[in-house]
């Protein structure tokens, strides 16, 4: 027997804004949704609502990178038939495909665990703090001397494997892929761009697959109506479009230590709230 309650419109709007703001920042959108849900609404919206609302932020990626995506697709299609047309964009298309394979395999193997997964706040808080060390180390050792023409299939596979860490709430998809890119010598902006392109197939597949569960959660959580899911997706799109534009400009001039500090403050703060039993872990 599952304990399911309906989401309020206020909850939908707040969580959609949180989703849009945090999806592209290396701070974990799923972790923030779990934290905000528990602190403000005393209940987790659930992984399915997160996955569906992510469709809005991924549409934001499609809009922001629209010209790049069309150019890559065009180059990839031409390169399939004409060897002379195998440009850097052609190979980038293949690298996105290769980098998507790890999370597709893990998603299929662990689909039941992902669908029914509960997000304990102690896991979220611990991951926020622990993975901030990885991000800081990547920023410290990253040479940032490789350009897009120097990418290869091994790089794509490494970043793709790093993307699977995003299944752990509190890690962050962008945090894991940008860190992997920095370890490989890519500059911050290129690492972020490649990570965002890599996320498109996986997030769209996850979001579409999770739509039925968002209406009827299979574990304890909150259910949403079709209108609420639509509004949440639109809000996440608008806020996400602003966020991705801001982040890429920010990364040109600033390092990731700002986000490292933020993650530690939030993670430690949540652990303190759990220790004094101000909020429940689940």
Curated annotation (Swiss-Prot):
Coiled-coil parts of chain: none
Protein family per UniProt: Belongs to the UppP family.
EC id: 3.6.1.27
Record gene name: uppP
KW Nucleotide-binding (keyword) present: no
A GO MF label: undecaprenyl-diphosphatase activity
Keywords tagged on the record: Antibiotic resistance, Cell membrane, Cell shape, Cell wall biogenesis/degradation, Hydrolase, Membrane, Peptidoglycan synthesis, Transmembrane, Transmembrane helix
Keyword hit for NAD: no
One of the record's GO cellular component terms: plasma membrane
Taxonomic lineage from the root: Bacteria, Bacillati, Actinomycetota, Actinomycetes, Mycobacteriales
Pfam families assigned to the protein according to its UniProt record, in alphabetical order: BacA
The organism of origin for this protein: Mycobacterium leprae (strain TN)
Superkingdom of origin organism: Bacteria
Membrane topology: Multi-pass membrane protein
Catalysed conversion reaction: di-trans,octa-cis-undecaprenyl diphosphate + H2O = di-trans,octa-cis-undecaprenyl phosphate + phosphate + H(+)
One BP annotation, GO: response to antibiotic
Extra information: Bacitracin is thought to be involved in the inhibition of peptidoglycan synthesis by sequestering undecaprenyl diphosphate, thereby reducing the pool of lipid carrier available.
Transmembrane segments: 90-110, 121-141, 165-185, 194-214, 228-248, 256-276
Subcellular location, record wording: Cell membrane
Listed InterPro entries: UppP
Name of the protein: Undecaprenyl-diphosphatase
Chain's role: Catalyzes the dephosphorylation of undecaprenyl diphosphate (UPP). Confers resistance to bacitracin.
């Amino acid at each position: 027997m599952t304990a399911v309650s309906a989401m309020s419109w206020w909850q939908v709007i707040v969580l959609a804004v949180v989703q849009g703001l945090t999806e592209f920042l290396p701070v974990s959108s799923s972790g923030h949704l779990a934290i905000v849900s528990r602190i403000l609404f005393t209940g987790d919206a659930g992984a399915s609502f997160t996955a569906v609302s992510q469709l809005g932020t991924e549409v934001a990626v499609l809009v922001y990178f629209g010209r790049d995506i069309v150019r890559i697709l065009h180059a990839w299609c031409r390169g399939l038939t004409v060897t002379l047309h195998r440009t850097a964009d052609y190979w980038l298309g293949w690298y996105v495909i290769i980098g998507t394979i790890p999370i597709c395999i893990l998603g299929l193997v662990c689909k039941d665990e992902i669908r029914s997964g509960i997000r304990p706040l102690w896991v979220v808080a611990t991951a926020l703090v622990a993975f901030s060390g990885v991000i800081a180390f990547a920023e410290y050792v990253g040479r940032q001397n490789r350009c897009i023409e120097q990418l290869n299939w091994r790089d794509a596979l490494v970043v793709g494997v790093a993307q699977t860490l995003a299944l752990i709430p509190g890690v962050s998809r962008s945090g894991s892929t940008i860190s992997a890119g920095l370890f490989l010598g890519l500059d911050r902006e290129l690492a972020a761009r490649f990570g965002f392109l890599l996320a498109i197939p996986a997030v769209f597949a996850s979001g579409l697959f999770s739509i039925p569960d968002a209406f009827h959660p299979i574990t304890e959580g909150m259910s949403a109506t079709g209108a609420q899911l639509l509004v949440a997706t639109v809000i996440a799109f608008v806020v996400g479009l602003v966020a991705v534009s801001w982040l890429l400009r920010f990364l040109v001039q600033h390092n990731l230590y700002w986000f490292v500090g933020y993650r530690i403050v939030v993670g430690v703060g949540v652990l303190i709230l759990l220790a004094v039993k101000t909020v429940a872990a689940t």
